[in-house]
């Protein structure tokens, strides 16, 4: 059995008894209770959200395979900068992320378009990224190796990511 750890330790803790049932654990950070030979330090390989319509609750992708996504042309860039952000405040990184978005909005004004369930909801992150030259990517944590769909979505949308997250990406 293989466990892929997809949440930071502030969000999800794994008891030793739970970890013991896996022969391999793939995680962006070291987990106590996992034998060194069973641990693979790597990105959790989260799937992207770009091009995935979520309003139906069924997560329907506009692309049926990777070749269709690759063939999708670069969208026209009519906006300058966007960010997709939730209003979650459970962790210090989430609170810092909200404070940064607030400060950026105050300084950049209408040049920054803020999206997210509680701000300006979108069914598909494509509509919040594709029209913009830059996309602010704010991870939920600052752990080495731990980047998420937030970063891959910017790349897939042909937007230059302005990134705050895993310090070893760079």
Language-model features and meaning:
Residues 2-169:
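Nucleotide-sugar donor-binding catalytic core of glycosyltransferases
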């Amino acid at each position: 059995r293989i466990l892929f750890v997809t949440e930071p330790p502030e969000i999800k803790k794994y008891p030793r008894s739970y970890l013991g049932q896996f022969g391999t654990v793939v995680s962006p950070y070291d987990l106590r209770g996992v034998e060194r030979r069973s641990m693979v330090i790597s990105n959790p390989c989260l799937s992207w959200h770009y091009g995935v319509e979520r309003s139906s609750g069924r997560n329907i992708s506009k692309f049926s395979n990777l070749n269709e996504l690759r063939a999708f042309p670069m969208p026209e860039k009519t906006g300058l900068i966007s960010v997709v952000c939730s209003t979650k405040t459970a962790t210090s990184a989430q609170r810092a992320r909200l404070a940064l978005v607030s400060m950026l909005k105050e300084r950049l004004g209408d040049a920054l378009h803020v999206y997210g369930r509680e701000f300006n909801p979108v069914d598909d992150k494509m509509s919040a990224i594709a029209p913009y030259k830059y996309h602010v990517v704010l991870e939920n944590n600052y752990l080495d190796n731990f980047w998420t769909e937030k970063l891959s979505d910017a790349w897939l949308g042909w937007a230059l990511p302005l990134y705050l997250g895993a310090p070893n990406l760079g």
